[in-house]
């Protein structure tokens, strides 16, 4: 007797859940439902969908797929990762308070401080590496603790089980931006999180060819409220983008494991070169190395450290020389693709964050974030070695 679908392994689910052969024509690849509206059999009598802003068959298949990868009951897909984060924060009212990891993605800072703050939400940006520190900042009007783990770009980790216990005791929701780890490397709902956010533009897609975002949860109430907001605000992905993502998750395990293996080899090599800083959770000297070993696990239980490395080359001159000499790595924003990318967070991904704040956190002008791809690791090492040579 074959296993039931909920007992399938990660890759089997990523390939088959939401991807069963089309019932009408038998096509193995899911069709794309490129339609804005649907025929109704009578007034208010539809066949499951009425308008693609509300729902679309291709999006429904993708949501089924992404939910199973996160071990979630529900998944809600958005046009971008920022659309997903904005929807999450829009669950709350003027006067409510949200705590956020201190070196979160710059787009989250821009949206929170320049948009939602004007609408009455209040924010504090705190060190979430220590659960006791999180507890100190929770107020009576705190509604949400939103953490990145690892953070972007300094790769600080939050102990999710301990932080979830703090939030539960205070009656506060815990949301986790899991973009850097993907469901293959970390499943925050299993560790006590209430909502998981991911930019599906990144490792879920893995080919730098689509924008998307997703929220997953086991809460029926949160799912209902988030779907109402999505219907009201309209930040939905197109059917084609949904289909591209549904295709891409089939290879998530292969891509993420290979890129992470490459990152481990490169980080250990870089750590011996005498750079100002090499930041990677897999290094013994990383402050939260033990947390990484505890919670960053593949579905079979193996420890995994992710595919992101940050290095500080010490000066703007060294940075510019490094970037100019690269030939395999591409200078570009984003991450998680099959191709290796690099960026300077100070001027790129975190440009919206005030200079004083960046420097206080350790985001210097000479800090370079590396997104490790699936190329031959020898070629990546040679490219970095050449770029670092004087």
Give the ranges of each region predicted by the language model:
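Short, solvent-exposed beta-strand edge segments and adjacent coil->beta transition regions
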Residues: 210-212, 304-308, 365-369
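Conserved N-terminal alpha-helix of the aminotransferase class I/II PLP-enzyme fold
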Residues: 37-86, 90-91, 107-114
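Positively charged, small/polar-rich N-terminal and surface patches that mediate targeting and assembly
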Residues: 3-11, 17-19, 235, 284, ...
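Conserved small-domain helix->loop->beta segment predominantly found in fold-type I
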Residues: 264-336, 353-359
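PLP-dependent enzyme catalytic core of the Aspartate aminotransferase-like
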Residues: 122-124, 317, 324-325, 340-390
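Short, well-ordered beta-strand elements within core beta-sheets of diverse protein domains
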Residues: 245-254, 306-314, 369-373
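Conserved PLP-enzyme active-site core in the AAT-like
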Residues: 2-6, 16, 75-279
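N-terminal "arm"/small-domain region of PLP-dependent enzymes with the aminotransferase-like
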Residues: 1-56, 62-65, 368
């Amino acid at each position: 007797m074959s296993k039931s679908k909920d007992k399938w392994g990660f890759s089997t689910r990523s390939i088959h859940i939401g991807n069963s052969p089309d019932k009408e024509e038998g096509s193995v690849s899911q069709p794309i439902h490129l339609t804005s509206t649907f025929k109704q059999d009578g007034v208010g009598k539809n066949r499951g969908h009425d308008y693609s802003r509300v729902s679309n068959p291709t999006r429904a298949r993708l949501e089924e797929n992404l939910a199973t990868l996160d071990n979630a009951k529900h998944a809600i897909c958005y046009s971008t990762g920022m659309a997903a984060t904005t929807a999450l924060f829009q669950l709350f009212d003027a006067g409510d308070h949200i705590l956020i990891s201190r070196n979160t993605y710059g787009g989250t800072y821009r949206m929170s401080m320049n948009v939602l703050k004007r609408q009455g939400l209040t924010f504090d940006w705190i060190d979430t590496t220590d659960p006791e520190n999180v507890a100190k900042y929770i107020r009576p009007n705190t509604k949400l603790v939103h953490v990145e783990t690892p953070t972007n770009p300094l790769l600080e980790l939050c102990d999710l089980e301990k932080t979830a216990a703090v939030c539960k005791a205070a009656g506060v929701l815990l949301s986790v931006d899991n973009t850097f780890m993907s469901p293959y490397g970390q499943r925050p709902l299993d560790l006590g999180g209430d909502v998981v956010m991911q930019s599906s533009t990144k490792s879920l897609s893995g080919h730098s060819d689509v924008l998307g975002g997703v929220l997953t949860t086991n809460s029926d109430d949160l799912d209902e409220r988030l779907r109402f907001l999505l219907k009201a605000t309209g930040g939905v992905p197109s059917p084609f983008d949904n289909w591209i993502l549904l295709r891409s998750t089939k290879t998530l395990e292969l891509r993420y494991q290979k890129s992470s293996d490459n990152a481990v080899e490169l980080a250990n090599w870089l750590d011996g070169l005498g750079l100002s800083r090499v930041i990677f959770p897999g290094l013994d000297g990383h402050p939260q190395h033990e947390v990484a070993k505890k919670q960053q696990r593949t579905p079979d239980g193996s420890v995994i450290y992710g595919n992101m490395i940050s290095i500080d080359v010490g000066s703007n001159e060294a940075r510019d020389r490094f970037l100019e000499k690269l030939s395999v790595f591409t200078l570009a924003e984003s991450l998680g693709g099959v191709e290796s990318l690099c960026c300077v967070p100070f001027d790129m991904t975190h440009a919206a964050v005030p200079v004083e704040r960046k420097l206080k956190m350790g985001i210097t002008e000479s800090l370079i974030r590396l997104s490790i791809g699936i190329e031959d690791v020898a070629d990546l090492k040679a490219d970095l070695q050449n770029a670092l040579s004087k």
